[in-house]
Amino acid sequence: MSNLPFLLEIGTEEIPDWMIVPALGQLRDSVQALLDGHGLQGKVSWVDATPRRLALRADGIIERQPDSKEVKKGPPIAGGQRAAEGFAKKQGIPVESLTQEGGYFVGVKMVTGRAAADILAADLARLIRKIQWPKTMYWTGGKTGPRFIRPIRWLVALLGGNVVPFEIAGVQSGAVTRGHRKLGASSVPVTVENYRDSLAASGVILAAADRRRKIETEIAGLLEGTGLKVHADADLLDTLVFITEHPTPILGGFDPQYLELPSEVLVTVMRHHQKYFSVEGADGKLAPNFIAVMNTNADPEGLVRRGNERVLRARFNDARFFWQVDQQKKLADRVADLASVTFQAKLGSYLEKT
């Protein structure tokens, strides 16, 4: 009996970055529990994801469960031969094979193992729908339709060289994935073995670790010889890894006049509003530069860079306006305004609390 590899891909609209890793953990555990529970002997080899797909591979799955014996407890011996014959007929076993134990007829039934493909086909839709998300949505069939974090657009399920057939919300599983929205094809045939390479050829870097490495390496290349260094931000890096399928960093700049604002204001605008890395000079002070990560492979004409610079300039202008307005009134002079902010209906305002 040969051992088979299994590939599952759930293709969706873009999933929020912070929800992806927990979902992958659930998917891994659910598939492994399915394999273990049915005695299929396989092990999940890896799980990985991009914003548009959750993917899993398992290896060593046997084609069919081993046949097994199931002991069935029958009617009391006092019921006689007729009871024994009825029990044997119901179980599909010869009446002469029955034994007597503890005052009851007992039969041993041979159970033919199910094909792994049939088990997977029967359970995969349930496992996918069982993934727990902080929020879910309907996208077809109204409130009677399935719920998921984002609409499911395609499904890949392959056991060895064969499709494992199942369906969710009218989407049938197959052997065709989708490439990068801009760099790849909308229809990419795959096998279990060429899955990663086929995605790569269609502009998708499947492994989160590879996307992370690409971002870090290319940022280092951008800053080499400039005397600048990126402000390390592990959380932002995690976000960028899971909002891109083909990340490419670009170095942009802004007018040094904005450095008159507190660095905390500028970094907050770049990091939280634009998902940019801030950049520091050799002296450790904020430099008039930033690093954005685009979801494509190149910006030969600088259009993406200039677009990001234009957006950041507008953000900084807004920040400067509010900073200047805030400075027109001392903090101590704002205490009286707390009278209009309720702390708790029965306890009074924040001024009274202060």
What are these regions (language model features)?
Residues 1-266:
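Long, basic N-terminal domains or extensions that often function
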Residues 152-153, 231-352:
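Catalytic nucleotidyl-transfer cores of nucleotide-processing enzymes
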